[in-house]
Amino acid sequence: MVFPFIMPYEALAINILIFGLFAMGFNLLFGYMGLLSFGHAAFLGIGSYLTGIGIVHYSLPWGTAILVGVIGAAIGGLIMGFLAIRTRGIYFSMVTLALGQIVFYGFYKAESLTGGENGLRGVRVDSFNILGIPVDFLNPLVKYYIILFFVVIAIWLISRILNSPLGAVMEAIRENEKRAAACGFDVTRTKLLVFVLSAAICGLAGSLRALHLSIVPIDSLHYLQSGQAVMMSILGGMGTFFGPFVGAAVMLYLEDVVTTFTRHWMAVIGLVFMFFVLFFPKGIWGTILSKLNMNQDTK
């Protein structure tokens, strides 16, 4: 739909789709449950690596490889969540960080499968058929729309989750965990379920990234990726539906522009982030929603 307007920046547009989805998956746990995880890079990396391994080492069809990546990330989320949700506050964050680093080290050492520090190369998807119609994945237009399709489906699923009874329970737990438990809600089970759903969505983002890059860099699992998800969510507006996506778009666009002028782009991004935290604590999208609501109230 919008592809003609973003040429020749299709790589940036695809990255925004992928990391926007990653941030939205993270925000499901952080923004809607109030649980700050520093280990979500593990799920981005698990999705990327399992999809890549499936294609490179086992010649799986790309659709099956994506499914393997998502399921693998969900299983990883189940294990990490089971261990982490028994803690609270900063302890929860530190446990997820430690577990994420264990996952990083595990994939780093499995060189025969993952390529170690060089990453996994050769994750190529050249062409395939959909309903008998040949599709060239190397065509940027085709790649953009295929990734957009998966992202739209995932966003729809997130919307369904938030508008379901589970979404109401999530909000109740975020606002007052003890009161939610007193009302009869299974807080621990809900936390674990949301953790798994969040991990699966982040795993899908990782799978799509592997197909987009045709390689899986080891930094997919690095804790800095988790930090990016935190920054994108806060920058756009944590606890808002599209906020993390907006944050991802702004952050990646700034990175793309600033890197052409200076190698110290991270410092510039940091200053922008501090500015919004200090003066727009609700984030970009959150501030826009607040202004719109105020305008409606005055009418």
What are these regions (language model features)?
Residues 19, 48-49, 70-74, 97-102, ...:
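Residue-level recognition of pore/gate-forming positions within transmembrane alpha-helices
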Residues 12-13, 17, 42, 63-71, ...:
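Hydrophobic alpha-helical transmembrane segments
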Residues 58-101, 246-247:
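Alpha-helical transmembrane segments within multi-pass membrane transporters and channels
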Residues 119, 175-178, 182-190, 258-299:
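Cytosolic-side transmembrane-helix boundaries in multi-pass membrane proteins
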Residues 99-136, 167, 262, 285-287:
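Extracellular/periplasmic helix-loop junction at the C-terminal end of a transmembrane helix
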Residues 67, 191-279:
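Transmembrane alpha-helical segments in multi-pass inner-membrane proteins
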Residues 7-58, 82-96, 172, 177-182, ...:
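Single transmembrane alpha-helix segments in multi-pass membrane proteins
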Residues 138-217:
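Helix-loop-helix "hairpin" substructures at the membrane interface of multi-pass membrane proteins
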